Amino acid sequence: SKILANFTAPYTATPVKRMQEAGAIMLGKVNLDEFTYGSSNESSAFQPSPRNPWKTDRVPGGSSGGSTASVAAGEAPLSLGTDTAGSIRQPAAFCGVVGVKPTYGRVSRYGLIAFASSLDCPGPVARSVKDAAAMLQVIAGADAHDATATPLPVPDYLAGIEDGVKGMRIGLSPDYFRITYPDPVTGELLSQVLPAEIELAVRQAAERLASLGAEIIEDVPMVNTRFGIPAYFVISRVEAASNLHRYDGVKYGHRSDLSTNDLKAMYKHTRHEGFGLQPKLRILMGMYVSAAQYSEQYYRRALQVRTLIRRDFEAAFDPRGKYRLDALLTPTTPTTAFEMAAVYGDSVLMQYADQLTVPANHAGVPGLSLPG
């Protein structure tokens, strides 16, 4: 973001510090959507934005598209991203690399530029599952600087990584093979099946897992998946508006050169000059839906939906329940990587690219995107 263009952080983020202490060599920063607000990388204040290294007329995905593109292009074996609604997993799918959203609280957010604090998760991007596991082993763990970082011991993510899937119960849900989206004219929610090539890829993966000894559990209900994006629209905007208020030009970051003795005018001009379109849209919507007269109608209901989504996952993974899943196999994205500029500018359509990933953020559970 332009508002932090010349900002030098006074301390090192915990995940970065832990990588450095483990001997990692930091090559530099990569580009991303402004404040992570996007699913294509095109909203970055620093242009040109990254392109998909496999097909350069396509987006790398976002918001952590610079992370996934750099790993896919062979510029680095590992990269660090953040995932609020799919921002590691979606670009990992578009770029054909491994992306992990850890359990919420497993990796410290200290030093992270916050988007939606109850959803944000730093995590690894790598060329292989083994590399991703090794990186997560390093960055995970309790942190006195972050009250949301869990104090639970970090498991050995590399132990048993070669054991295979024999005996595992892996679920398929029909609710992940349909996408729900708003009619651009009426606003009515419509539903359609995923493109055949995407469903086929998942079905073939299930067949392969079954051949390796996994038990595939069909028709696992995840009925509240379709409400994930509308709830995310509200929750993330309220939290983003709150987090963005700290950028006012007083102590750090961009400050307007406009001569004025009015503090409010300085705030206004600084934010107008420093924020791009996407932060401005999130501030407006966040302040609107959190206003006293609308909070019950929108924000409270969105939090209730988040609880329903979490219960879907709890029922699916309950060791004493009907399904007793070890994993849920789903598509990562409802489309393949789209062309540059094809979707950018349509904030609603862009957000619906995260429809299949955002439920894991609402539930706080881990998610992994694997290339086909």
What are these regions (language model features)?
Residues 89-95:
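Structural signature of FAD isoalloxazine-binding scaffolds in flavoprotein oxidoreductases
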Residues 3-8, 120-127, 286-291:
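Short, well-ordered beta-strand elements within core beta-sheets of diverse protein domains
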Residues 1-8, 36-37, 151, 157-161, ...:
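Short, well-ordered alpha-helical
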Residues 1-84, 203-213:
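Gly/Ser-rich catalytic/binding loops embedded in alpha/beta enzyme cores
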Residues 30-38, 223-228, 333:
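Short, solvent-exposed turn/loop segments enriched in Gly/Ser/Thr/Pro and often Arg
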